[in-house]
C-alpha cells in the first residue's frame, strides 16, 4: 500500500491574493506535503496577468486548466485547455487572460524548491527599460 501519497481538492485550499496585482493563488506545496517541488495555482480574471519574472535556479511546469496565453521572453503563445508548458530557469515568463468574461486557472510546479520569497521561490523581475 502506498504511504507517500497525498490528494488535495483545489476548493479545499484557501485562495489568497497577490499583494501587487491582486491575482488569486493557492499554495499547494504544504497541503500536498511536497518536499522536492513547489506547487501553486494562479487564477486570473479577464484582462489580468502575472508579473513577468524568471527564476535563477528553478525549472517550472505550467498547466493551463482553462487555456490561456503565456508570454515567454516577450513572445506570446496561446496555450490550449489542458496544455502543459516547461520553462527553464532563465526564461522570462508571464501568464495572461485575454478573455472578456472567463476566469483562467493555471497549476504551476517548480523544482527544486529553492528560495523563501513568500513561499514562491527565488525569482527575478526584469528591469524596466523606461
What spans do the regions from the language model cover?
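Short acidic-glycine-tyrosine-enriched beta hairpin
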Residues: 74-90
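A short, N-terminal "cap"/entry segment at the start of jelly-roll beta-barrel domains
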Residues: 1-36, 46, 120-130
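Short beta-strand His + acidic residue motifs that chelate non-heme Fe in jelly-roll/DSBH
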Residues: 52, 70-71, 87, 93-100, ...
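Short, conserved beta-strand element in jelly-roll/cupin
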Residues: 43-45, 54-71
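Structural motif
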Residues: 18, 72-74
Amino acid at each position: 500500500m502506498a504511504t507517500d501519497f497525498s490528494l488535495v481538492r483545489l476548493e479545499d485550499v484557501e485562495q489568497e491574493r497577490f499583494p501587487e496585482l491582486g491575482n488569486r493563488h493557492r499554495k499547494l506545496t504544504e497541503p500536498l506535503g511536497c518536499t522536492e517541488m513547489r506547487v501553486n495555482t494562479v487564477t486570473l480574471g479577464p484582462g489580468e496577468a502575472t508579473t513577468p519574472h524568471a527564476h535563477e535556479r528553478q525549472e517550472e511546469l505550467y498547466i493551463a486548466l482553462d487555456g490561456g496565453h503565456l508570454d515567454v521572453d516577450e513572445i506570446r503563445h496561446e496555450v490550449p485547455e489542458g496544455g502543459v508548458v516547461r520553462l527553464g530557469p532563465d526564461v522570462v515568463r508571464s501568464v495572461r487572460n485575454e478573455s472578456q468574461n472567463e476566469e483562467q486557472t493555471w497549476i504551476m510546479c517548480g523544482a527544486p524548491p529553492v528560495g523563501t520569497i513568500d513561499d514562491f521561490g527565488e525569482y527575478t523581475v526584469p528591469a524596466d527599460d523606461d
